[in-house]
Swiss-Prot record:
Taxonomic superkingdom: Eukaryota
The protein's name: Ethylene receptor
Cell compartments where the protein resides: Endoplasmic reticulum membrane
Annotated cofactor note: Binds 1 copper ion per dimer.
Source organism of this protein record: Passiflora edulis (Passion fruit)
Length: 738
């Protein structure tokens, strides 16, 4: 035994125990060697593993542990020192590696524990995300239902259809057993069952609006759960054996109460709502979920908006119908007014013609009598007749002018005229009357007043004569001054007339005319009345001088046509009166100073001029008028030939006739003028053709000018007027009075 290098076991081996230890060490070694292989396999399969060095150490530790158990198989029997040395080395290495691994695990284990914490956190986060996704899906589903319901609700603008559709769609979407709408009554003190889901024509149950449950619902815009046994929820036809389903109620704002015929809300009440009640089925355990309540609230708001739109549409349709009725009534009134205006104009035209014809006889014969030898008493009577006839003729002219102004048919006849000559003509016309009444006339024309202007000369003269005539009528003594200036733009603003807006321009100017008298004056409160047609003041001493009351009314219309303004000023009775008017006149583009292209109608006193031997042809189908006009012409020394028809006029007319007076109101009157031009082709051979008419309409003048007449004279005609007409015609002046 001394030569054997073996280590004896310390105790005798038992065969059975040795056998079990041997087998156990073998399997332990096998397990230790398989674990690193498994770790290596799964680490290679893993894309991310942050602890590779730890794995190497752990693998080495396991391999060494397996090696010690494997070497330990040779230590159960007699073994050499070499085996003991290998065993020792293996255990030392195992101890070193195990200690290093243990030290490394001190740093690794917290990370491994935190990984578990993160895992739990991620699981919780994932669960939360799942819940949020569920909410999002629920919201999307709710939104889809809201859009669908909104589309159905707003697909019509009929109020009843909107409410019926709302109940049907809510019942289908939420699977409701019943859905009802309670509307306020006319008094606003009760709610009436108006619409239900299951009943087409619900019985009109009513409940007081002051119920606590109704106050609770009306106090919030959220859906409120209410008791199934409250009055507004008792809508089920059969009680059934199941527990009633949950019931919610929500208010529906009524934005347009008038459309619901609610007239008498309580004085302090702001509860302008309807009540919508929704019931879940009784045979289910369903409960109202949050998203369903939100859906109900949104639908209630959409119903309110749709009802508002429907109410607005109903109002607009009623307004349209009312407007159509008003338009029909206005159109009927317009047609009636046009018919009345045409009838009035036709009446005035006929009366004008029929009145001027006998007036022509009265004035003509009176003027003829005035130039005969009469006693003072006879002359006074003739002058009175002539004055009254002229006044009546003026009244006829005023009525016709006012009629044309009112229906808008009167238009200004603008042309270039001598403005200074207009004022001189007015002065010449009023001088005889002023001299009789011993009134001093003063005319002041501003140095910068243009000599020529563009406008309606005839209407301007008419305005000035009317105003000056009024001044003379109400002035027994003293003076009358006429002042004409170019108005400065800054002085035209008048606070009393806010709608008068003069505009500056290089092509026109504003003429300001002031007529001041020392007459009886006017009460300041009576001034506005003077511009009303047919209105007259009770001025002392003026009643005997009053006229028709149309003069100033017509003047105002003419001034307005000329883009002007007229007003009166007076400090009171006995203190005189000042009439001021402003009109807009044009400035001529250029003037030929040597020979103006126009002639102003300045009054010329022809005295007792006669026309001995002047051959005149007179055509008139009215025997009285023909006789009177012939008398005037004979009185002026003319050789007169009279005819009663156009055919006879064409046949009788010759080169010897200097003037042809024809009544264009008779049949074929204008045609006769045309045929005269055809008969006398040369201008110097044709007699002057003048219309003698009682028509004052614009068409008559246009027709006279169209057929080439040399003038148009308006009846009635006096001796002086006929004398002036003949003088102007022989001087080749064109005269158109109508």
């Amino acid at each position: 035994m001394e030569s054997c290098n073996c280590i004896e076991p310390q105790w005798p081996a038992e065969e059975l125990l040795m056998k079990y230890q041997y087998i156990s060490d073998f399997f332990i070694a096998l397990a230790y060697f398989s674990i690193p292989l498994e770790l290596i396999y799964f680490v290679k399969k893993s894309a991310v593993f942050p602890y590779r060095w730890v794995l190497v150490q752990f693998g080495a530790f396991i391999v060494l542990c397996g090696a010690t158990h494997l070497i330990n198989l040779w230590t159960f029997t007699m073994h050499s020192r070499t085996v003991a040395t290998v065993m020792t080395i293996a255990k030392v290495l195992t101890a070193v590696v195990s200690c290093a691994t243990a030290l490394m695990l001190v740093h690794i284990i917290p990370d491994l524990l935190s990984v578990k914490t993160r895992e739990l956190f991620l699981k919780n986060k994932a669960a939360e995300l799942d819940r949020e996704m569920g909410l999002i899906r629920t919201q999307e589903e709710t939104g889809r239902h809201v859009r669908m319901l909104t589309h159905e609700i707003r697909s019509t603008l009929d109020r009843h259809t909107i409410l019926r559709t709302t109940l049907v769609e809510l019942g289908r979407t939420l699977a409701l057993e019943e859905c009802a709408l309670w509307m306020p009554t006319r008094t606003g003190l009760e709610l009436q069952l108006s619409y239900t889901l299951r009943q087409q024509n619900p019985v009109g149950y009513t409940v007081p609006i002051q119920l606590p449950v109704i106050n609770q619902v009306f106090s919030t815009n959220r859906a409120v759960k209410i008791s199934p046994n409250c009055p507004v929820a008792r809508l089920r036809p059969l009680a059934g054996k199941y527990v009633p389903g949950e019931v919610v109620a929500v208010r529906v704002p009524l934005l347009h109460l008038n459309n619901f015929q609610i007239n008498d809300w309580p004085e302090l009440s702001t509860r302008r709502y309807a009540l919508m009640v929704l019931m879940l089925p009784s045979d289910s355990a369903r409960q109202w979920r949050v998203h369903e309540l939100e859906l109900v609230e949104v639908v209630a708001d959409q119903v309110a908006v749709a009802l508002s739109h429907a109410a607005i549409l109903e109002e607009s349709m009623r307004a349209r119908d009312l407007l159509m009725e008003q338009n029909v009534a206005l159109d009927l009134a317009r047609r009636e007014a046009e018919t009345a205006i045409r009838a009035r104009n036709d009446f005035l035209a006929v009366m004008n013609h029929e009145m001027r014809t006998p007036m022509h006889a009265v004035i003509a014969l009176s003027s003829l009598l005035q130039e005969t030898e009469l006693t003072p008493e006879q002359r006074l009577m003739v002058e009175t007749i002539l004055k009254s006839s002229n006044l009546l003729a003026t009244l006829i002219n005023d009525v016709l002018d006012l009629s044309k102004l009112e229906d808008g048919s009167l238009q200004l006849d603008s042309g270039t005229f001598n403005l200074h000559a207009v004022f001189r003509e007015v002065l010449n016309l009023i001088k005889p009357i002023a001299s009789v009444k011993k009134l001093l006339l003063l005319l002041n024309l501003a140095p910068d007043l243009p000599e020529y202007a563009v406008g309606d000369e005839k209407r301007l003269i008419q305005i000035i004569l009317n105003i000056v005539g009024n001044a003379m009528k109400f002035s027994k003594e003293g003076s009358i001054s006429i002042t004409a200036i170019v108005a400065k733009l800054e002085s035209l603003r008048d606070a009393r007339v806010p709608d008068f807006f003069p505009t500056p321009s290089e092509n026109h100017f504003y003429l300001r005319v002031q007529v001041k008298d020392s007459g009886v004056g006017i009460n300041p409160q009576d001034i506005p009345k003077l511009f009303i047609k047919f209105a007259q003041t009770q001025t002392t001493g003026a009643r005997n001088s009053s006229g028709s009351g149309l003069g100033l009314a017509i003047c105002r219309r003419f001034v307005n046509l000329m883009d002007g303004h007229i007003w009166l000023e007076s400090e009171g009775l006995g203190k005189g009166c000042t009439a001021i008017f402003i009109v807009k006149l044009g400035i001529p583009e250029r003037l030929n100073e040597s020979k103006p292209p126009f002639m102003s109608k300045v009054a010329v006193d022809h005295g007792q001029t006669t026309f001995p031997g002047l051959k005149v042809l007179l055509m008139d189908d009215n025997g009285v008028s023909r006789m009177v006009t012939k008398g005037l012409l004979l009185h002026l020394g003319c050789d007169v030939t009279t005819v009663g028809s156009s055919e006879e006029c064409i046949r009788v007319a010759s080169q010897d006739h200097r003037v042809v007076f024809m009544d264009v109101g008779m049949p074929e009157g204008f045609e006769a003028a045309v045929r005269l031009h055809e008969k006398f082709t040369k201008r110097h051979e044709r007699p002057l053709v003048v219309a003698l008419t009682a028509s004052t309409d614009r068409m008559t003048k246009e027709n006279c000018m169209r057929v080439g007449m040399d003038g148009a004279i308006l009846k009635p005609v006096s001796v002086d007027k006929m004398r002036s007409v003949l003088s102007d015609l022989l001087e080749h002046k064109v005269l158109f009075e109508c």
